[in-house]
Amino acid sequence: MSVVLFDLDGTLVDTAQDLGLALNMQLTRHGKSPLPHERIWPVASHGTRGLLELGFAVYPDDSQFEAMRLEYLDLYESVYTQHPLFLPGIAALLAALDSKGIKWGIVTNKPRRFSVNLTKAVKLGDSNLFERAACLLCGDDAPQPKPAPDTLLMACAQMQCQAEQCIYVGDAQRDVQAGRAAGMKTVVALFGYLAETDRPHEWGADALIQTPAALLENLSCCD
């Protein structure tokens, strides 16, 4: 494999603290009690939809969903660069990929309005995640975000590679679905935002890894 593509939240970067902070600000605004971090962590990878379902039991087909979604995004915009950190072992993994000459990029469902500044806020050596990644594709860069393969295929076009040369690493079922639909090998990051009810062994990925370092061991398995 010559290219590794990563999901962002819960795969490369721990953003759960700021996602949860915005949700708790919204809950407080609506007279509800804030939620503890351990309740928020497992759904942090599911974006605004998952967070609103957790906090308010509001779903996309509810009449108030869109207003709640926009309110949440405005609150998140005020806090989203406060606490982002690499998940343990990720900085070392990216350095190892660089040393091996393996190109890597980011494909996320996070809107571009957040993704660019977030990746710029996460330092990697003497630069930052945004500068070091070979590409950054966001959920609103294509008509359909993951689990559709559109943004993954756009990443291939930007990096001038074929999908079969790529591994896509993520922590959600939609990541596996998108990668497989694009014709890529897929790896589940078990260290990410998985809930107890998730069953990653049933998602059809080519490999599951407990730590970022294990990805290096699995590169040959995905050839």
Regions found by a protein language model. Give the residues of each.
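Residue-level detector of anion-binding/catalytic polar loops
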Residues: S33, K103, K185
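Asp-based, Mg2+/Mn2+-dependent phosphohydrolase catalytic module
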Residues: M1-S2, P111-D223
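N-terminal helical cap/lid subdomain that shapes the substrate entry/recognition surface
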Residues: S2-A92, S99-K100, R113-V116
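Conserved SAM-binding loop
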Residues: L5, L12, W104-V107, Y168-V169, ...
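Hydrophobic, well-ordered secondary-structure segments
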Residues: Q26, Y72-Y76, Y80, G105, ...
